[in-house]
Design a protein with these regions (language model features):
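S-adenosyl-L-methionine
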Residues: 1-185
Length: 185
């Protein structure tokens, strides 16, 4: 049941139906319970489970997470910081593309179930995949601004990674973290 709800409520179909039932910014349990529920049998639980894994891992890569161990770019065993940042950028982009594919697959499934394939947008732009480390989301240009180049996204990602590395290094110096052990000391 939980996978069913996660998949459905995170679909563009549910977003459209909620917009019809509750056109204001207020959303209450009543509007959710009024959504037309179809007995569709089995939805693909892999989608919601994998998306939860991806987003949880993304969150745990941040120092503000209770489960933060160490900066993710320090886990690859690279001898050069440039190589570590390159690998982290590549993995961040790959994770964002995987999440985009799963979200699109989920949207397509629910649009087909409700026969709304021509009414709702099923494709998810990479800039809407709200992973913290998705460069296209984190550094999306403001409305009306020109699109950024791949090199600009990479550079902004490196800058943020460098700031986070400095923060972690200060934490190590102050005794909050250890180079030898993951997480808080």
């Amino acid at each position: 049941v939980m996978d069913y709800l996660l998949n459905f409520l995170n679909s563009s179909t549910a977003e459209m139906l909620i917009g019809i039932l509750s056109p204001t910014v207020s959303l209450n349990v009543g509007e959710i319970s009024n959504l037309p529920a179809l007995d569709v049998g089995v939805c693909n639980p892999h989608i919601s489970q994998r998306l939860v894994e991806l987003f949880h891992s993304d969150w745990d890569a941040r120092e503000t997470s209770w489960d933060f161990a160490r900066p993710p770019y320090l886990r690859g065993g690279h001898s050069l910081l440039q190589d570590a940042f390159d690998d982290w950028y590549r993995r961040s982009c790959e994770t964002a593309v995987e999440a985009q594919r799963l979200e699109t697959e989920n949207n397509r499934y629910w649009a087909d179930v409700y026969s709304l394939a021509d009414e709702v947008e099923v494709d998810v732009p990479l800039s809407r995949v709200s992973l913290t480390y998705n460069p296209r989301f984190a550094f999306a240009p403001t409305k009306g601004a020109p699109e950024r180049s791949e090199e600009e996204y990479r550079w902004l990602h490196y800058q943020r990674s460098a700031r986070e590395l400095i923060s972690w290094a200060i934490g190590v110096t102050m005794g909050r973290y250890s180079v030898d052990m993951p997480g808080l000391v």
